[in-house]
């Protein structure tokens, strides 16, 4: 299951002393680079944590559309081929495993701690609208005592977590951006994280599935599957671990997100029900 981190203990991130508040840019940014679905997180940039679940909404900029000709079996991941790369099921590692993990990602990661309480500002950085290809270069994190904004790799160097779980890719989806190009560009960003803090364990999370009805016609579940298949190979090539969480978020009969797992208003952002399933999966893999 989880890379040796579960058997070893280490002083936790001394983040509260190092970090006043993680401030993420893009106060009202688009989840998807090619249009639609604005998602404004309530209280973004404020100095107090807001736990208002009424903020769990998205303003849809266009009508919901359905994918055409999606074959859920077309890009199935060969779990036997990648058995040394895909994290296997294991005993529940508990909240301590989550607490010593730094979560990096886009707005679905931001929702983990800004809308829900699965992690906190101490161990998550979610930047709305951020893509995997910008991981190495996009400065979006501010620390007390440091001027300007830091990139996520620079933040990892300052925070020194036991491991990082990265969830990017939704904002990279585009018919003109191949899975191989995405994986290659994303890998450069992950290597920047490794270079910034070499002792960190790298776990790449699957891109979450879309709802069968979603707000951006440029997004397809076919491409989500293609990207995830490329991510497993990328992880194997680089000695990283792959968290195949899509398997618990997907409806096995359709290949799309399970009913109730994405917001009905956009078919993209994960609901609390989905987050609950996701974090159970994280603790047990």
Language model features by range: what are they?
Residues 42-100:
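N-terminal, intrinsically disordered, polar/charged segments of Gram-positive cell-envelope systems
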Residues 91, 95-184:
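Conserved SGNH/GDSL esterase-like catalytic core that processes O-acyl groups on lipids
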Residues 167, 205-206:
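Alpha/beta-hydrolase-fold catalytic nucleophile elbow
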């Amino acid at each position: 299951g989880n890379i040796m981190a579960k058997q070893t203990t280490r002083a936790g991130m001394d983040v509260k002393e190092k970090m006043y508040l993680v401030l993420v840019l893009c106060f009202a940014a688009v989840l998807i680079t090619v249009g639609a679905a604005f998602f404004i997180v309530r209280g973004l940039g404020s100095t107090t944590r807001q736990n208002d679940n009424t903020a769990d909404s998205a303003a849809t900029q266009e009508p919901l559309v359905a994918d055409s000709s999606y074959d859920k079996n077309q890009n199935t991941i060969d779990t036997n081929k990648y058995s040394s790369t895909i994290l296997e099921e294991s005993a529940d590692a508990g909240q301590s495993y989550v607490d010593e993990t730094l979560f990096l990602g886009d707005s679905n990661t931001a929702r983990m701690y800004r809308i829900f309480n699965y992690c906190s500002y101490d161990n998550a950085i979610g930047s709305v609208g951020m893509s995997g290809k910008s991981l190495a270069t996009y400065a979006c994190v501010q620390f007390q005592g440091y001027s300007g904004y830091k990139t996520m790799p620079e933040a990892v160097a300052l925070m020194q977590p036991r491991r990082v779980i990265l969830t990017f890719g939704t904002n990279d989806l585009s018919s003109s951006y191949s899975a191989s190009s995405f994986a290659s560009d994303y890998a450069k960003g992950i290597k920047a994280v490794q270079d910034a803090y070499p002792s960190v364990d790298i776990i790449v999370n699957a891109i979450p599935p879309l709802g069968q009805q979603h707000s951006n016609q440029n997004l397809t579940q076919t491409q989500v599957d293609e990207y995830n298949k490329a991510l497993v190979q990328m992880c194997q090539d680089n000695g990283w671990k792959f968290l195949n969480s899509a398997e618990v978020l997907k409806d096995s009969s359709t290949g799309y997100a399970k009913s109730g797992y994405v917001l009905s208003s956009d078919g993209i952002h994960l609901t609390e029900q989905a987050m609950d399933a996701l974090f159970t999966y994280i603790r047990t893999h």
